[in-house]
Each structure stands twice: as C-alpha cells, then as structure tokens.
C-alpha cells in the first residue's frame, strides 16, 4: 500500500541561477555563479550570489574529482546543491520570463514535504487510481533462459510499472504534478511526449482533475504512436504536432517550452523526464522515487535483502532514476542504465547520449548531449520513440562521471529480439523502451554469479509498439 512517506521525498535546496534557454556548446560563455562565503549559513530568503565567467568547465576540477581527492563518498553529493546542480551538471539555463515560475514551483514543491493533506491525497490517488504498489514479479522462465549449463545463473525480477493505470511509470509524476498545479492555481497544463505514454498520463490526470490539457508531440512520433495520439484526444487533450527540426521528442520539448514562456502566468508545464531546468530533474525524480522505495520493501519481504543489480532503460532517464534513487547510497548495489544504440554506435544513428555524447546545455540544463564539433545537436535515432532524445537527465550524467552507475547501449535489432523473447517466455509484451533494458540481460547475465538478484524496471507495456514491431518481426 502506498503511503505518504513512499509517495514522494523532498530535499530542500536553494534557487539556482543562469539565463540561457538555447543549446550552448561554447564553455567560455557559460556564467559560473559562486556563493558568497557566508551564503551556506543563510536562509534561502537572504541568499546571495556573485557572478564570474568560467574559462571552461573542463578547466574547473569536476566535483566528483574533488570528492574523490578528499576521500569522501561521492554518492553523498548526489543531491542537487543550492544552484540545482549535480556536480557540474544541471542548473537553470532559462530566460528571465521563466525564473519566477521556476522559483514559485520550487517553493511549492518543498512546501509539500510538510503538507499532510497533499501527502494523504497523493497517497490515496497512487493507491486507488494508479493502482500502486506495482508488483515485484519473479520472471521464472526468463530466469531459466539465462541458466548456464551447470545450472547456475542470476534470478530475474521485474518491477511491473506496466501494470499502472495508463500502462507505464509516467503516471507517477503526472498525477503528482497535476496536484501541484492545482495548488498553484494553474488551470492550463502543457506537456511534451515522445512515445506518447507521458502524454497519455498527462491527459489522463487532466481529465481526472478537470484541467485544460495541451500535448506537444513530434509529427514523426505521432505516426509511430497513432494509438496513443487517439487515446490522448479521447481523454480530451489537444495534441499539437511539431513539424520543425527532426519532428521528434527534442522538438516537442522545445515547443512546449516556447508555449510556457508565452503563457507562464496561467500554465503549468508537466515535464515528463528528469531533464530540464531545476527543479524539474529533482522533482520528477522524487515523484518517481516510489518505484525504488517499493522495490526495497518488496525485496526485503521476498528474500530479506537488497537487489544485487538494478537495470533500466534510459532516454531522458525518469524510470531509471525512480528505481536508482533509493539505492544510490547502497554502493554494493550495481545500477545499470541502457541507452538506445539504434543502428549501432558507429553508425551516427543512435541515441546513446551517455556513451557517445559531450557536455553541453539543452532545454535548460547542462548534461551530456549528442552534438557535433560546432555544438549543433545531432539528430538521434531509436526504434523506440521514448528513447529518441539527444540529451539525458543531469543526475545520470553525474552518476556516470563519479562511476556510481554504469551505462550501456542496445541496438534496434537487439531490442526487437528482446521484445519477442520476453513476450513468449513470460506472456508479457514489453514496450520497446523496456525492451532495451531486457536486451541487455543477454550480455549481463552470463557475467553474474549464481543466485545474483537482478531487478529490471519493466517501465511500460508494448501495446503501443505493436504496429512498429509488425514492420520488422516475423511471428
């Protein structure tokens, strides 16, 4: 049963400062904000900053290196600092128009930590409307599939987020942000979507709470996910196709931000991933942290311990961070994120941001990005619309750099094979996003000791992807 304590965890931090919305590659132009000597001892209301221009973030020793040099545990720095940064990643690179809205959002977010009515309402909705808690399911036949000839092998468990209302993890964040928007008095909701699951979740909660809903979706993704487009419209949402750029998730996000800048007084932006400007990466993570909290509780009930390995797909990274966050300080628990390698890492047609990207700024935050030598965004590719994004959440970038999490990639072909394999072994059709994580088991399981317990976040169901799979699979 979901409780207020498992529904969300809030960690106070002060407002971050910066002022660029568009993508930046030239580090010499990035402002570096430094607290005045006594700032950390002051209240947030009296917080001050001084501003200098950094020559290059690469010249400034990364926070992870400082921590290691000092002999400290780098995971203790995993929470964002007073500027919304995870090490050198994150921050708030937005136009002045949005600064007040983001500060207002952050203040409201923290106030919910002590708001018993909000926590109670959220817990009840997660339980009775979303259907939490989601099961931690022992995948018996998948486990048998990975047994070696000597009978040894890992034990595979699936965290069944596909059983949530709307069929994916996205509803956790959408319902919490909708409640938050009501507290802010915002009647108009906008969101971006790639695979359509976040769009469906947002349209669902807007119908539930009587809010106006506008969804931005790339025209290419609308073709790939026609079923979800119909579902959103059936729920009363206006779906606006985005034809600019690559007509995928990146461009949908850009259009949503433009809308927000124009209508900031009346509109709340339900960003769907742990990306974007502070406080979104922290806020979305905390609303999804219920996944990891339940996993810890369920693991203790099932075998009296923790998982040995956590596995999740990574596009923007919300489902992975929802699972990982609870276990970040448990350094004996491996955390593995799986990106989309598309046609292959050397093909130039992939979405493996953490594997092949460089540091830059996109959609309001500094993180790893797919970009060329001139700092222009490279068009990503994945058969999965939900992983087809050229950036990643800043906390994932931080966890990669400090070595706390591992990140690998899986091709379209490998994901399709896993889509078919798991459907036939377990009778569960996975989303193509989830199929990337499932595909990595082929490489991971042979390396694990006998009896190692692997928890894979089954982030969504595959009904939406059947039309795509028909084009490539023989069944």
Curated annotation (Swiss-Prot):
Protein name per its UniProtKB record: Tryptophan synthase beta chain 2, chloroplastic
Annotated localization: Plastid, Chloroplast
Transit peptide interval: 1-51
Signal peptide: none
Biased composition (Polar residues): 1-21
Functional summary from the UniProt entry: The beta subunit is responsible for the synthesis of L-tryptophan from indole and L-serine.
Biological-process GO terms, alphabetical: L-tryptophan biosynthetic process
Similarity comment: family membership: Belongs to the TrpB family.
Subunit comment: Tetramer of two alpha and two beta chains.
Keywords attached to this entry: Acetylation, Amino-acid biosynthesis, Aromatic amino acid biosynthesis, Chloroplast, Lyase, Plastid, Pyridoxal phosphate, Transit peptide, Tryptophan biosynthesis
Pfam family, one: PALP
Cofactor: pyridoxal 5'-phosphate
Enzyme class, first EC level, given as a word: lyase
Protein's UniProt keywords contain Coiled coil: no
Presence of keyword Transmembrane: no
Residues bearing PTM N6-(pyridoxal phosphate)lysine: 170
Catalysed transformations (reactions): (1S,2R)-1-C-(indol-3-yl)glycerol 3-phosphate + L-serine = D-glyceraldehyde 3-phosphate + L-tryptophan + H2O
Native species: Arabidopsis thaliana
A molecular function GO annotation: tryptophan synthase activity
Start and end residues of each stretch annotated as Disordered: 1-44
Any Gene Ontology CC annotation: chloroplast envelope
Stored CDD domains: Trp-synth_B
Organism lineage: Eukaryota, Viridiplantae, Streptophyta, Embryophyta, Tracheophyta
């Amino acid at each position: 049963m979901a409780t207020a304590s498992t529904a969300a965890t809030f960690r106070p931090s002060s407002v971050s400062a910066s002022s660029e919305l568009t993508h930046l590659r030239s580090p010499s132009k990035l402002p570096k904000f430094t607290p005045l000597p006594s700032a950390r001892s002051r209240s947030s209301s009296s917080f001050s900053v001084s501003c200098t221009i950094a020559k290059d973030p690469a010249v400034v020793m990364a926070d992870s290196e400082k921590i290691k040099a000092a002999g400290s545990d780098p995971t203790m720095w995993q929470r964002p600092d007073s500027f919304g940064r995870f090490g050198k990643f994150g921050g708030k690179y937005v136009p002045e128009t949005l600064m007040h809205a983001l500060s207002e959002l952050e203040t409201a977010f923290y106030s919910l930590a002590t708001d018993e009515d909000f926590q109670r309402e959220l817990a009840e909705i997660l339980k009775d409307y979303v259907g939490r808690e989601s099961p931690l399911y022992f995948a018996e036949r998948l486990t048998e599939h990975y047994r070696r000839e000597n009978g040894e092998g890992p034990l595979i468990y699936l965290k069944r987020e596909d059983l949530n209302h709307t069929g994916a993890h996205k509803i956790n964040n959408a319902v919490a942000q909708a409640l938050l928007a009501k507290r802010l008095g915002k009647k108009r909701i906008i969101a971006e979507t790639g695979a359509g699951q976040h769009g469906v979740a947002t349209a669902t909660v807007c119908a539930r709470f009587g809010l106006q809903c506008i969804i931005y979706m790339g025209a290419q993704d609308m073709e790939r996910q026609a079923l979800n487009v119909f579902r959103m419209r059936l729920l009363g949402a206006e779906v606006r196709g985005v034809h600019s750029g690559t007509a995928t998730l990146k461009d949908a996000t850009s259009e949503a931000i433009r809308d927000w800048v124009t209508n900031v007084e009346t509109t709340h932006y339900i960003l769907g991933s742990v990306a974007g400007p502070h406080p979104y990466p922290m806020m979305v993570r905390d609303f999804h942290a219920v996944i990891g909290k339940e996993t810890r509780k369920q693991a203790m009930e099932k075998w009296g311990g923790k998982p040995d390995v956590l596995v999740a797909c990574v596009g923007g990274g919300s489902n992975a961070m929802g699972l990982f966050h609870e276990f970040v300080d448990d350094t004996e628990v491996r955390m593995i994120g799986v990106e989309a390698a598309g046609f292959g890492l050397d093909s130039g047609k992939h979405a493996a941001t953490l594997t092949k990207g460089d540091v830059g700024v996109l959609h309001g935050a500094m993180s790893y990005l797919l970009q060329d030598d001139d700092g222009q965004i490279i068009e990503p590719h994945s058969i999965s619309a939900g992983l087809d994004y050229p950036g990643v959440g800043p906390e994932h970038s931080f966890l990669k750099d400090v070595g706390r999490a591992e990140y690998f990639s899986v091709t379209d072909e490998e994901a399709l094979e896993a889509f078919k394999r798991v459907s036939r072994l377990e009778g569960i059709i996975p989303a193509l996003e989830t199929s990337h994580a499932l595909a990595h088991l082929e490489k991971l399981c042979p390396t694990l000791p006998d009896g190692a317990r692997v928890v894979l976040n089954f982030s969504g169901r595959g009904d939406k992807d059947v039309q795509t799979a028909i084009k490539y699979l023989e069944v």
